[in-house]
Amino acid sequence: MSSSLWLQCLQRLQEELPAAEFSMWVRPLQAELNDNTLTLFAPNRFVLDWVRDKYLNNINRLLMEFSGNDVPNLRFEVGSRPVVAPKPAPVRTAADVAAESSAPAQLAQRKPIHKTWDDDSAAADITHRSNVNPKHKFNNFVEGKSNQLGLAAARQVSDNPGAAYNPLFLYGGTGLGKTHLLHAVGNAIVDNNPNAKVVYMHSERFVQDMVKALQNNAIEEFKRYYRSVDALLIDDIQFFANKERSQEEFFHTFNALLEGNQQIILTSDRYPKEISGVEDRLKSRFGWGLTVAIEPPELETRVAILMKKAEDHQIHLPDEVAFFIAKRLRSNVRELEGALNRVIANANFTGRPITIDFVREALRDLLALQEKLVTIDNIQKTVAEYYKIKVADLLSKRRSRSVARPRQLAMALAKELTNHSLPEIGDAFGGRDHTTVLHACRKIEQLREESHDIKEDYSNLIRTLSS
């Protein structure tokens, strides 16, 4: 009964939850029904706490729906479902004994999955270098709605490298925290296991190492090195585009690492299938584990980032100043940090207190550029071009989905990227009421949670408008 009951719950949860959430949190759960108690086993404490906090009501509701009057008690445990005792071993024949006698010789011929790297080899200029930045850890990564899923996945991978989500593929625009998460995973893996061999690198470094190995006739050493790591963290995988020899070598490295249960984490500025110049067989493999989008931070996260960075610099940043900066600089974390560094430097040089007027003066060129780039008119033109419709359609009364959805997206973008009020936005979209704009913003926020396509479109448009 446990398998059928939990299977029914799983099927419904898969329909109700976004695909990425279901794959990350619910699918790994194992179930056992015993004495009218359904025990759900989570792979680790982090998953257990998350499921109990976020999905307990959903699970209880479905248990009541599918169990009728005999609703089982629900409990959670960390671990795996107990394994059923094996059947008694069959009687062995003489042929079985003869076959077993040859097994040790066969095993002796097998090579270990984790190969060793000969550090004394002079054939190739490759030595173990982790390149993991010790400054980038989970405890100084600012969590928000835009990166929550990516952070949770990274934490799970660091707790169970090679087992949870392999490969993990993080994608999103420049300066959103993907590289920070790569380093944080690397640091956490080494903290948990000081002997772990973790390597972080930009994809171009992989290409450089391969070229150098070919020049030095040391390609076998190159292969042994990259296939012996416990975790390979590669940034900006899109730079493999049109490098056929590098793609060929990485394809075989990828397969070897996965076969050996060694962790792979990749980042890119776009969704795997949208990376041009990369072979389909590689793009397909990029999606074998878990693919998570890292989106531009929302206002609250931008404020939290500024406050955290100011605290790191031992600088008091008034709340109203943090909100002033965060409302005007929206594209990425790197831009926020750069702006704050400029404000702090100006304050140190002049000895003046950090106020809104002071920030407006210190960042006047940057703020002027942002206000010039992102206007409602610019948003309308960009959205219309993206969806291959006319700006006049966005301003019209047409309600067909092919027009209504882009219009709602454009309104949501105007609220996110400009300082205009809801009535002003409504007026710019054909004289619509502010409640229409509010409904559009809420609808798009909901769809970004439920629809990968809408989430992707929204991220692409923000990236275009902020570039």
From Swiss-Prot:
It comes from the Bacteria. PROSITE patterns: DNAA (PS01008). Residues 1-87 are annotated as: Domain I, interacts with DnaA modulators. ATP binds at residues 175, 177-179. Residues 131-347 are annotated as: Domain III, AAA+ region. Its main location: cytoplasm. GO terms for cellular component: cytoplasm; plasma membrane. Residues 348-467 are annotated as: Domain IV, binds dsDNA. Residues 87-130 are annotated as: Domain II. One of its GO terms (biological process) is DNA replication initiation. NCBIfam families: DnaA. Plays an essential role in the initiation and regulation of chromosomal replication. ATP-DnaA binds to the origin of replication (oriC) to initiate formation of the DNA replication initiation complex once per cell cycle. Binds the DnaA box (a 9 base pair repeat at the origin) and separates the double-stranded (ds)DNA. Forms a right-handed helical filament on oriC DNA; dsDNA binds to the exterior of the filament while single-stranded (ss)DNA is stabiized in the filament's interior. Oligomerizes as a right-handed, spiral filament on DNA at oriC. This is Chromosomal replication initiator protein DnaA. It comes from Vibrio cholerae serotype O1 (strain ATCC 39315 / El Tor Inaba N16961).
